[in-house]
Amino acid sequence: MHATKAAGHRVIAVGTTAVRSLESAWDAAAPASDPAVTARGFEGREDGADVRGEGDITVREDATTNLYLMPGSTFHVVDALITNFHVPRSTLMMLVSALATRDQIIDAYEEAVREKYRFFSFGDAMLIE
């Protein structure tokens, strides 16, 4: 993740869970003095060790996150997202709205309704940049 960003490449997440996982991993590896991490609520590892600033770290496969991304959130890793059309007024809609402007989201959903796209888990997908 860090090498990809350092090389100037884009990170395109597939699914909202991937977005939250990647952004949470960045929080875990960010310098302890970074105010963006404090603002997002990073509390260190379960064992209390503060690993921030150690660069690339391995995140346990059973790790969890409480990261809530919404309009105004800063994305440090993810540049774009491929995701399905989510239910209005959901936390997933908030995450999607954090990556695009309100007008872009409204336009996409109006087209989806007009063109009879499928919604939810087995629906059509969109690319948000």
Model feature map: region roles:
Residues M1-E129:
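Surface-exposed, charge/polar-rich loops and edge strands
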